[in-house]
Every structure is written in C-alpha cells, then in structure tokens.
C-alpha cells in the first residue's frame, strides 16, 4: 500500500518524508488556504521535496475553465496530478485530460457508482471520502470494499485513494480491503507508529540498562 500525505504544510511534508512514509501528496484549496501562501509557490516547493504524485486541485466548475487551469498546473512539474470534482463537468474534463496524457484524481466521491464513472472517464485515481460518510452515520469503509470489488471485476486501472481518513483504523481497514493508497493527515501518520506497550517496553529496557554495571 502507498501512503500519500494529505496536507499543504511543507514542514509536515518534510518531516513525514524523512520518516520514509510519503509516496505522494494530496492538496486542496482549503489546505492551501491554511498555509497562507500562493498556490503555485506551495505546489512548486512540494515537488522539490517528494518524488511522487502531487495532487493539485482546480477551482473552476466548468469544463473549459478546468482544462485551462489543468494545462497551467501540469506545466509546473511532471509529477502534478490534476484534482477534479466528481461532477458531470469534472468527468468531461477527466476525459479530455486523459486524451492529452495528463493524470487526474477525481475527488469528492461518496458512492461506488461515482468511482465507476470516474474510472470509465479515464481517471488515474479516484478519491472516496470515508470520514465524511462516517460523519453522517454511513459506513465509509463499505464503499471502499465495493469500489475494490467493482474495479477488480472489470480490471479497471484507476487506483483507489482512500481520503478523509480520521484515525488509524481507517488505514488498517483500507489495507485489509486492498485499497491502493491512503492519503493521511500527518497527525494520523504519527499515530500509526504509536502503541502504549511499545513505550512501556522502551521504558523497561532503559530502566534495566541502568542496572547493568558500568
């Protein structure tokens, strides 16, 4: 399984990359806004840190505007993946960019059928949002299983990026289901490495070491 980091915070990206945990990065307008920096400036800096797919989202909601934005974003670096909304116009743009050889990540997916449509349009990645489904008392992980089954049934090439991850259990369930990628907030990445028995074991080893004659 590949891990993407879901942030536009360059400091977090550097730290996670140093841990060897970052195969790619996903950003969105909300994350960029939190950084307080210019969009292109942030994206360029990220491409200099991580050698992997960097998802950058368009703002336009209609096909021609999406294509114009995508064309400019794709010029920044070969690793740029264009993030498009799961709408009819987004699907049209996905198809256009597929024909031009530009990679896409269709986002804000909440049903298996939306994922299927995105894959048929030529999306490189599909991003179902599990946490937001959980928030409205639906089972977010259930759609990951359904998407995995559909894609396997038909040999679809689109990779599943599990998004809106809130806790380590989301990552565990994604791995068990066979999702291709989890895009994870840095805080959750750090939680993956923690367990109280690990800390207790280290403490015990150090206490025992102090008893060894020096």
UniProtKB/Swiss-Prot annotation:
Disulfide bonds: none annotated. It is an enzyme of class 2 (transferase). Transaldolase is important for the balance of metabolites in the pentose-phosphate pathway. GO terms for molecular function: aldehyde-lyase activity; transaldolase activity. Keywords: Cytoplasm, Pentose shunt, Schiff base, Transferase. The lineage of its organism: Bacteria, Pseudomonadati, Thermodesulfobacteriota, Desulfuromonadia, Geobacterales. This is Probable transaldolase. It catalyses: D-sedoheptulose 7-phosphate + D-glyceraldehyde 3-phosphate = D-erythrose 4-phosphate + beta-D-fructose 6-phosphate. It comes from the Bacteria. GO terms for cellular component: cytoplasm. Belongs to the transaldolase family. Type 3B subfamily. Pathway: Carbohydrate degradation; pentose phosphate pathway; D-glyceraldehyde 3-phosphate and beta-D-fructose 6-phosphate from D-ribose 5-phosphate and D-xylulose 5-phosphate (non-oxidative stage): step 2/3. It is found in: Cytoplasm. The active site is at 83 (schiff-base intermediate with substrate). Its main location: cytoplasm. Its EC number is 2.2.1.2. It comes from Geobacter sp. (strain M21). GO terms for biological process: carbohydrate metabolic process; pentose-phosphate shunt. SUPFAM superfamilies: Aldolase.
């Amino acid at each position: 399984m590949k891990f993407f980091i879901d942030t536009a915070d360059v400091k977090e990206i550097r730290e996670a990359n140093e841990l060897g945990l970052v195969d790619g990065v996903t950003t969105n307008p909300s994350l960029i806004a939190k950084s307080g920096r210019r969009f292109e400036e942030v994206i360029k800096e990220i491409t200099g840190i991580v050698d992997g797919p960097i998802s950058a989202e368009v703002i336009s909601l209609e096909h021609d505007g999406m294509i114009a934005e995508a064309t400019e974003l794709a010029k920044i670096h070969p690793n740029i993946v264009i993030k498009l909304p799961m709408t009819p116009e987004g699907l049209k743009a996905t198809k256009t960019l597929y024909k031009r050889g530009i990679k896409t990540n269709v986002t804000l997916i909440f049903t298996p059928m939306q994922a299927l449509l995105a894959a048929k349009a030529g999306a490189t990645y599909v991003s179902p949002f599990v946490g937001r489904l959980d928030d409205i008392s639906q089972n977010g992980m259930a759609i990951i299983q359904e998407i995995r089954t559909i894609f396997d049934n038909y040999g679809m090439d689109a990779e599943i990026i599990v998004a809106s991850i809130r806790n380590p259990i989301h990552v565990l369930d994604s791995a068990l289901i066979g999702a291709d990628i989890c895009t994870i907030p840095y805080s959750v990445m750090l939680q993956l490495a923690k367990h109280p028995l690990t800390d207790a074991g280290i403490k015990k080893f150090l206490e025992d070491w102090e008893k060894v004659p020096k």
